[in-house]
Amino acid sequence: MARVKRAVNAQKKRREVLEAASGYRGQRSRLYRKAKEQMLHSMTYSYRDRRARKGDFRQLWITRINAAARANGLTYNRFVQGLRLAGVEVDRKILADLAVNDAAAFAALVEVARAALPAAAETSAA
């Protein structure tokens, strides 16, 4: 049976790892073993943080909506409740964008939510 020489494959694998780690600091970009270890950690962080990013953005949107709603005299909780009762189906991403870039449209939505709230309070009290 012929002997299998693996030098080409090994060199290619090492080169790919070192190229992927090229932006890292110190030994992590120059030594294969350190670079490989750092790449494993980096991939783990990337995977984890791609999922965490979704929650981070939702939190940012809620903070922006709350600030704009309070500026219009309503808390976030009451604002979202009023929108739900009024049948307005706008997601938090769009609401946050309106709050930042189009204050007049957001104020109109606050009024829609405010108008829907007292009607709900009267029906629940009866």
UniProtKB/Swiss-Prot annotation:
CDD domains: Ribosomal_L20. Signal peptide: none annotated. InterPro entries: Ribosomal_bL20, RIBOSOMAL_L20_CS, Ribosomal_protein_bL20_C. Gene3D superfamilies: 6.10.160.10, Ribosomal protein L20. One of its GO terms (cellular component) is ribosome. GO terms for biological process: ribosomal large subunit assembly; translation. One of its GO terms (molecular function) is rRNA binding. It comes from the Bacteria. Keywords: Ribonucleoprotein, Ribosomal protein, RNA-binding, rRNA-binding. Belongs to the bacterial ribosomal protein bL20 family. NCBIfam families: rplT_bact. Binds directly to 23S ribosomal RNA and is necessary for the in vitro assembly process of the 50S ribosomal subunit. It is not involved in the protein synthesizing functions of that subunit. HAMAP family: Ribosomal_bL20. This is Large ribosomal subunit protein bL20. It comes from Parafrankia sp. (strain EAN1pec).
